[in-house]
UniProtKB/Swiss-Prot annotation:
Database matches in CDD domains: pyrophosphatase
Recorded catalytic activity of this chain's protein: diphosphate + H2O = 2 phosphate + H(+)
Subunit: Homohexamer.
Any GO CC annotation of this UniProt entry: cytoplasm
Protein's recorded name: Inorganic pyrophosphatase
UniProt source species: Buchnera aphidicola subsp. Baizongia pistaciae (strain Bp)
Gene (name only): ppa
Amino acid sequence: MTLNTVLSGKNIPEDIYVIIEISAHSNPIKYEVNKDLGLLFVDRFIPVPMFYPCNYGFINKTKSNDGDPLDVLVHTPYPILPGSIIRCKPIGVLNMFDESGEDYKIIAIPHPKVCLEYSSINDICHLSPTLKQQIIHFFKHYKNLENNKWVKIIGWENKKNAEKIILSACEKFHK
């Protein structure tokens, strides 16, 4: 079985499957799943000595505005191995722009059946202010030393908007 066969979720948009590409707090290496092969490749080494504050991955069978699957940051008590699939619930979205255009980062936590620790978190407003600041700081600066790459942070949006973005990305994929 390859990652290409993974569904978008159990009950879209409230219950999603996220394919993890980069573990939280890991070395500054950008991994991406090759969409044709369904295998994890090293995309590039990030020249800024920073680590992802959360696990980073995507929802399969979605298409965002840049043509790639929809990006997701998953806050967990422990880092998740790249290539793993985790059942999640979205709680919000970080809206930003980069050199490719509008770029959404869905923020999710493990589904309560996977981890009870975050069961009281139902929206981005329930997430720790420190973690939200770390996420913004990371995305503001992780491309700083790369030529012709930039990021502009727009701000946070709630769970309802995250779910709309997920539904839209699923529809774009199936067109």
